[in-house]
Design a protein with these regions (language model features):
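Membrane-interface helix-loop-helix junctions at transmembrane boundaries of multi-pass membrane enzymes
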Residues: 168-171, 224-227, 265-273, 352-373, ...
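Perimembrane helix-loop-helix junctions
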Residues: 210-227, 248-280
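Start-transfer (signal-anchor) and selected internal transmembrane alpha helices
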Residues: 1-37, 272-279, 425-428, 481-510
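Transmembrane helical bundles and short interhelical boundary loops of multi-pass, membrane-embedded
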Residues: 261-262, 267, 282-285, 294-309, ...
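Transmembrane-helix motifs of polytopic, lipid-linked glycan transferases
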Residues: 147-170
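Membrane-lumen/periplasm interface segments of multi-pass, membrane-embedded glycan/lipid transferases
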Residues: 268-277, 285-359, 458-479
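Interfacial juxtamembrane loops and adjacent helix segments
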Residues: 63-142
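Short acidic/glycine- and proline-prone juxtamembrane loop motifs at membrane-interface regions
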Residues: 192-200
Length: 510
């Protein structure tokens, strides 16, 4: 009895903050900022997917006719022809779909004179992302693009970190690993881009984490913390829905995954389950209202040149490259920056290894949740292609963190997923090396074009920003920053601190 009282006293006694832990938090925070800056600098304006469209839409959202003039003429359904600043005109993407051509061609495009033709959003995407980013739009396009990329990065990382902090302490290490193994390279690239897909992915992932925590929350938590949790959960949904209409579908999938993982069928969770059901319905309604079926095609057009049966057959064969393309199987940029083979090899090793460890002792609830997410991940691209359209890996990226997170998390009453030091080191090291290779290739593609090789990015530079660190320094800082982030995740995985199991109440509320 005395031993039990002593143990209880230790649990209740406020814990002193370890100075080393506080220092690690500061170092990791700095590393995340540096990492975002490196990826923001890695590509020029126009380097992100459909950047001419998204940047024109942002500047047009300012309402300033001096930087954007609408014509009322449709280029295609819900895409309007507009006149924009010369720096946003056709020369912005002069290197698109030409991997051997550097971004130096932008200097040859006119930067003076009247407005130039482009295309902008007219209902194809929700307008929230463009209106928000237009707050940072100025006539200095290069500077504005960098500011917007850092804003996108900060918003994405902030959503993920806040959601992560609300999670049960026992889940934080698995969740950190889930993000590490599913968001490289495409996720981090999009977070620091002018494409709305980045913040949409972060919003969906943050919603899934907070939805799971919400279902686990018990009566011992304070009202303030409950409201804060719900606020973060709704923020993730709103950010995702105002960025992409198809995000509503993924919100619904994330709701189902969280509900199944937490055992939402239990009587005690029925009220909270209704909240998730309502959010899922809102998400589906948003997707249907946005008629996002036209959006899937993106820049790739339709498959009208192929017979429907042949297209579906090819889509089935290509499911891995579409579903897992975000891990390096697919190119970055405007689908014109192929990744080195080592990126896909190491990321598939890390993703598959973590997934297998997570399902080694899976419960029925976990298997059901995994089946739901993976079923959508496999079936969705086939269904979309069968409708005569195409799917890029970034459209399916929101499901990867949810899938990996579902595999790695456990209910409070179940044994947590454990990682040995060797396993953790192998997984983290693989991702760190893959990230370094992906960042190097991305910078190389725009500095000289991929027809030139070698480790030194500072040799024979054809394009770079007018100020700031050079291409080689940017890569070194970005690679080092990510290595620090990887070290933080490794420390979480091997910390060995066990959380007492005490029912289903989430300690994040205490």
């Amino acid at each position: 009895m005395a031993e039990e009282r002593s143990k209880a006293d230790r649990i209740r006694r406020p814990q002193r903050t370890d100075p080393r832990s506080a220092l690690l938090v500061v170092v990791c925070a700095i590393a995340l900022v540096v990492l975002g800056l490196a990826w923001s600098l890695a590509s020029p304006p126009g380097g992100s997917p459909d950047d001419d469209f998204h940047l024109a839409s942002i500047w047009c959202a300012t309402g300033d006719t001096g930087v954007c003039r609408r014509t009322g003429v449709e280029v295609r359904a819900r895409v309007e022809r507009v006149l924009v600043l010369p720096a946003l005109g056709p020369g912005l993407v002069c290197f698109a779909l030409q991997p051997e051509r550097s971004a130096a061609c932008q200097d040859e495009a006119p930067h003076e004179g009247g407005l130039k033709p482009s295309r902008a959003n007219d209902g194809l995407y929700p307008g929230g992302f463009y209106r928000f980013m237009s707050l940072f739009a100025t006539r200095n396009v290069d500077r504005s693009v960098l500011v917007m990329r850092m804003v996108s990065w900060t918003l994405s990382i902030a959503l993920l970190l806040v959601a992560w902090l609300f999670a049960r302490p026992a889940l934080r290490a698995p969740l950190a690993l889930a993000g590490l193994t599913s968001l490289v390279p495409l996720g981090v690239y999009l977070f620091a881009s002018n494409n709305p897909s980045g913040v949409a992915v972060a919003g969906i992932a943050a919603y899934w984490v907070t939805a799971l925590t919400f279902l686990e929350g018990g009566g011992e938590c304070s009202t303030t913390r409950k409201l804060a949790l719900v606020g973060v959960m709704l923020a993730g949904v709103v950010v995702a829905l105002v960025s992409r209409s198809d995000a509503g579908l993924y919100v619904a999938v994330a709701s189902v995954a969280a509900w199944l993982s937490a055992g939402g069928h239990r009587v005690a969770l029925r009220r909270r389950s209704l909240v998730l059901a309502a959010i899922a319905c809102v998400g589906i309604a948003a997707t249907l209202a946005g008629r996002e079926n036209e959006h899937w095609a993106g820049e790739l057009g339709t498959n009208e040149q192929q017979a429907r049966t042949a297209a579906v057959f090819e889509a089935i064969l290509d499911v891995p490259s579409r579903a897992l393309g975000a891990l390096g199987l697919g190119p970055l940029g405007a689908l014109d920056t192929p990744m080195p083979a080592i990126v896909a090899a190491l990321m598939l090793l890390a993703f598959g290894g973590a997934l297998l460890i997570g399902v080694a002792a899976a419960t029925r609830e976990k298997w059901l949740a995994l089946a739901a997410v993976s079923g959508i991940l496999v079936a969705l691209p086939v269904l979309v292609v069968s409708a005569g359209e195409n799917v890029q890996p970034r459209y399916l990226l929101p499901l990867l963190p949810v899938l990996m997170g579902t595999a790695l998390v456990s209910r409070p009453v179940d044994p947590p997923v454990r990682f040995g030091r060797g396993q953790a080191l192998l997984l983290v090291s693989a991702v760190v090396v893959a990230h370094g290779a992906a960042l190097h290739r991305t910078i190389r593609r725009y500095v000289t074009g991929v027809d030139q090789g070698g480790p030194d990015l500072g040799a024979s530079v054809e394009w770079w920003w007018g100020r700031g660190p050079g291409p080689m320094a940017t890569w070194a800082l970005g690679a080092l920053a990510f290595a620090v982030v990887g070290a933080c995740v490794y420390r979480l995985l091997v910390a060995g601190k066990e959380e007492p199991v005490s029912g289903s109440t989430s300690t994040a509320f205490r």
